[in-house]
UniProtKB/Swiss-Prot annotation:
CDD domains: Ubl_ubiquitin
Other comment: Ubiquitin is synthesized as a polyubiquitin precursor with exact head to tail repeats. Some ubiquitin genes contain a single copy of ubiquitin fused to a ribosomal protein. In D.discoideum there are 9 genes: ubqA: 5 copies of Ub and a final Asn; ubqB: 1 copy of Ub and ribosomal protein eL40; ubqC: 1 copy of Ub and ribosomal protein eS31; ubqD: 3 copies of Ub and a final Leu; ubqF: 7 copies of Ub and a final Asn; ubqG: 5 copies of Ub and a final Leu; ubqH: 5 copies of Ub and a final Asn; ubqI: 4 copies of Ub and a final Asn; ubqJ: 4 copies of Ub and a final Asn.
The protein, known as: Polyubiquitin-I
Cross-link (Glycyl lysine isopeptide (Lys-Gly) (interchain with G-Cter in ubiquitin)): 48
Domain (Ubiquitin-like): residue spans on this chain: 1-76, 77-152, 153-228, 229-304
Sorted UniProt keywords: Cytoplasm, Isopeptide bond, Nucleus, Repeat, Ubl conjugation
Amino acid sequence: MQIFVKTLTGKTITLEVEGSDNIENVKAKIQDKEGIPPDQQRLIFAGKQLEDGRTLSDYNIQKESTLHLVLRLRGGMQIFVKTLTGKTITLEVEGSDNIENVKAKIQDKEGIPPDQQRLIFAGKQLEDGRTLSDYNIQKESTLHLVLRLRGGMQIFVKTLTGKTITLEVEGSDNIENVKAKIQDKEGIPPDQQRLIFAGKQLEDGRTLSDYNIQKESTLHLVLRLRGGMQIFVKTLTGKTITLEVEGSDNIENVKAKIQDKEGIPPDQQRLIFAGKQLEDGRTLSDYNIQKESTLHLVLRLRGGN
């Protein structure tokens, strides 16, 4: 049967083969036609590198199938580059290649400009002027590719378990966008996420710039447990504050949340519900405060009763 072999230069070679031919035989035929030694040939079909001892039939290669020929440079090696989408790119490199070269190869394969690429290995960001050998990157090492958005920046999100997530964002991203990025990375639904920065809970409709969140700022992620609820707190000025709470939260917790939002110290807060002043040690459930209940906040003046 006839099969085709396409090179990286775009040239297509036609070969006469049998299904029972092994990959070594095919490489020998390519050497006959093109003069490329078998040990410099890598053949790819359906995204898989073909092994010398296997046959065309083993890989279900049939008539008029197209194989791709990649040259293995003398002294060269293969490395892998994994993107945030989970895609893995295979590159042919030399230990002496610098990081700029590697980014150029990624651009050739994926069309991503080098100035938008950040490469990470063993937790370190790789610098353009250094070589793969400088970082002890060896054959079949995996690098991680993070895209640097134009005008974008990196921020960190720390969870209660101590894990830190790195996100690529823009100052103009709103908090909903950030929660969506966290969902993409961690699988946590946005409605279960509460993001805290500088002691304040971030509101969905506001942007990172609104909160003066800059590059390498750290946000804190608190999970809103299912079974949580929203309540409202109305001040004497008529302002209404929305709080995320649990029925098991005690009144002290609620006052702390109000302090986070409004900056009012707990000892200056008096909370009223259904005509009763709420006591610190009791819980919302004790007072039968349910979702969307409204509490009234009265300020206790310093020195007052």
